[in-house]
Regions:
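Activation segment
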Residues: 106-108, 146, 231, 273, ...
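Non-catalytic accessory segments flanking P-loop/AAA+ NTPase cores
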Residues: 1, 6-12, 46, 54-56, ...
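Soluble catalytic regions of large protease machineries
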Residues: 46, 249-266, 272-438
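Walker A/P-loop NTP-binding motif of AAA+ ATPase domains
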Residues: 2-192
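Residue-level signature of catalytic and energy-coupling elements of molecular machines
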Residues: 17, 42, 59, 155, ...
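Short conserved motifs of the RecA-like P-loop NTPase core
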Residues: 105-107, 182-198, 209, 224-226, ...
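Active-site phosphate-binding and catalytic loops of NTP-dependent enzymes
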Residues: 25-33, 131-132, 240-242, 277-286, ...
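AAA+ ATPase "lid" subdomain C-terminal helix
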Residues: 193-240, 259, 272-284, 353-359, ...
Length: 438
């Protein structure tokens, strides 16, 4: 198996990397066309997305000898090591120099991008320019580098490696589950949606943690419950559902408006209902918990890119208000736990008013306008509050028209504490859903 075969997903990126490797291995075909191979490639992105494996795949496919340079020496010795690495590469050209985690060559400080190490790298790249030395670098934080280092001529290609999303996340999770004992009813698609946008390393850790849970429970296979528990533990840093000895959320208290656990349940159910009405299929996880000194819950959403950006923004604001509205609609009480939701809703709406001009261009703030004008700020804040009130009324309408869905979801949350997307969709299928337009 080649190293390119070991890269799961990322088909568009792999295609581009293979093309670059081909220019290095078969340069005579390109020379006949009068074109030259790129001099350098920089792969950048968050840690754990597979940059090092991709770099290794290019080296293998190119057929060239590689000289690796990574920060594993004191500063003075390391500068010397950089020069020696390029000297060896030029002696054995055609070759590749791999600058692994190049943003760590200096102090990793964004305030000091002109460190001696980077100056040395620039000088060495320029010296090797006509010596058939291809420079390959991996970087986590581009802001640590001087812009002159990654300009065209030094690195002709810059490729951002993003966290896996959609089918990429699905393929990677399937790969990590492939050689493990798993239950037949595992829905990999649900886990992929929960983990959408997380690094490959996080996906691998969740699958392995699920296996550890299964082993400790002496289970014959990894179940959906184990995977969901692993998501709670590794992704959301939430308390587990398995230890219920001090669980203070009870289905028996579901009609008691003064019970804090009940308010938590309806709060999270409100978020979920609003999201499912406005963006069907968007809820990936709903969780509630209340222990002696630890309480809360959350609803995780899948950001469906098929909706317009403005609709996604407005629906996020509506979802944020759903928890507060649910307790007001159900019990007529103010939800004291909704402060963060209100902050998020007002912050997003203020951005739409000030930076997107949704309430008129007279409220738009631009570079040379006096954004600190008291009158302008007062108008912007008034417009923001007015729009929030308008959406809040819509949210209460959604909950009122879909009361059956809200009640059944709250009932299920109070019993199970953790609901997957499949659980939510099953409950939803049993209810009459009334669409409401924002």
């Amino acid at each position: 198996m080649s190293k390119f075969d070991m890269i799961i997903g990322y088909n568009a990126v792999k295609k581009e990397l293979k093309q670059i490797a081909d220019t290095l291995r078969n340069r005579e075909y390109y020379e006949k066309l009068g074109v030259s191979a790129p001099r350098g490639l920089l792969l950048h992105g968050e840690p754990g997305v597979g940059k090092s494996l991709m770099a290794a795949a290019i080296i293998e496919a190119s057929g060239r000898k590689a000289f690796v340079c990574r920060k594993d020496q004191p500063n003075g010795d390391f500068v010397k090591h950089i020069k020696e690495t390029f000297d060896k590469a030029m002696e054995e050209a055609p070759s590749i120099v791999l600058l692994d985690d190049m943003d760590k060559f200096a102090n990793g400080d964004e305030e000091h991008p002109d460190a001696e190490e980077y100056v040395t790298v620039q000088s060495c790249i320029d010296e090797a320019k006509h010596k058939e030395v291809f420079v390959l670098a991996t970087v986590n934080n581009m802001r640590c580098l001087p812009k002159s280092l990654y300009r065209v001529g030094r690195f002709d290609r810059l490729i951002k490696i993003r966290e896996p999303e959609g089918n990429d996340a699905l393929e990677i999770i399937r790969h990590y589950l492939k050689n493990k004992q798993v239950a037949e009813d595992i829905d990999v698609g649900i886990i992929a949606r929960i983990m959408d946008g997380r690094s490959c390393a996080e996906l691998e850790t969740v699958v392995n943690t699920a296996g550890l849970f299964a082993g400790y429970a002496r289970s014959e296979c990894i179940t959906m419950e184990h995977l969901l528990e692993a998501c709670l533990r590794n992704v959301f840093d939430a308390p587990p559902t398995t230890n219920d000895s001090d669980d203070m959320i009870s289905h028996a208290n579901l009609t008691n408006p003064n019970n804090e656990g009940t308010q938590i349940v309806y709060h999270e159910a409100g978020h979920a209902v609003v999201s499912e009405v406005l963006r069907p299929g968007s809820v990936t996880l709903a969780y509630v918990y209340k222990r002696l000194n630890n309480r809360g819950g959350f609803v995780e959403y899948y950001d469906d890119q098929t909706y317009t950006p403005l609709y996604r923004d407005l629906s996020r604001i509506a979802c944020a208000l759903g928890g507060i509205a649910a307790n007001e609609w159900k019990f007529g009480v103010t939800d004291i736990g909704g402060g963060r939701d209100l902050d998020n809703a007002f912050s997003e709406m203020k951005d739409l008013v000030i930076n997107r001009g949704i309430c008129g261009l007279h409220l738009y703030s631009y570079g040379y306008r006096d954004a600190n004008s008291q009158n302008l700020r007062a108008e912007q804040e008034q417009a923001t509050a007015k729009e929030i009130e308008k959406i809040y009324r819509k949210v209460k309408e959604i909950l009122s028209l879909n009361a059956e869905f809200l009640e059944k979801l709250a009932d299920a949350l109070s019993r199970k504490k953790l609901l997957s997307a499949a659980d939510v969709q099953k409950i939803k299928s049993e209810c009459k859903i009334v669409p409401v337009a924002l």
